[in-house]
């Protein structure tokens, strides 16, 4: 399979939101309960194509990363990969790109991962991230790039 990576376009907002819902609904439902309107509003509030890298296999959106600058930190809002395309290097490629950007900018790279998503926490630890703090629902992780 060949994957292409590029910056998102405004016109992809709906497809990105659908992928977000597909992958994240189970975790969010278990922690807080899922509210369609709240999720759509929150997604729209934070949607910024300049901070989003999309991954396609041919014309199908199969993953994305969403990054924000927060002071002296490059913060990963989300790395999402379609379940049928997980464990094929997409998440690692997206994460390595963010870490490289952090190094260029001499910034720390941070993120939060749900405590119930043990697989994701292990993925980030494998890539050098450490748990620095926690909230009631998430681990706060960081990496000095």
PLM features: what roles do these ranges have?
Residues 43, 124, 129:
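Conserved active-site tyrosine of GNAT-family acetyltransferases
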